[in-house]
């Protein structure tokens, strides 16, 4: 799904692919 794709992009690029979802990303744990 989109979230899995976003995590893959983050892993590959080291960048958050969804900057507009920064707060949501923090909630879900971009760092693992």
Swiss-Prot record:
Q: Where in the cell is it found?
A: Secreted
Q: What else is known?
A: Does not induce platelet aggregation and does not inhibit collagen or ADP-induced platelet aggregation.
How would you summarize where this protein is expressed among tissues?
Expressed by the venom gland.
- EC annotation? 3.1.1.4
- The entry's Ca(2+)-binding residues are 27, 29, 31
Native source organism of the sequence: Bothrops mattogrossensis
Signal peptide from the UniProt entry: none
Protein name from the UniProt record: Basic phospholipase A2 BmatTX-III
- Magnesium listed as a keyword: no
Catalysed reaction(s)? Answer: a 1,2-diacyl-sn-glycero-3-phosphocholine + H2O = a 1-acyl-sn-glycero-3-phosphocholine + a fatty acid + H(+)
Describe how the cofactor binds.
Answer: Binds 1 Ca(2+) ion.
Tell me the subunit arrangement: Monomer.
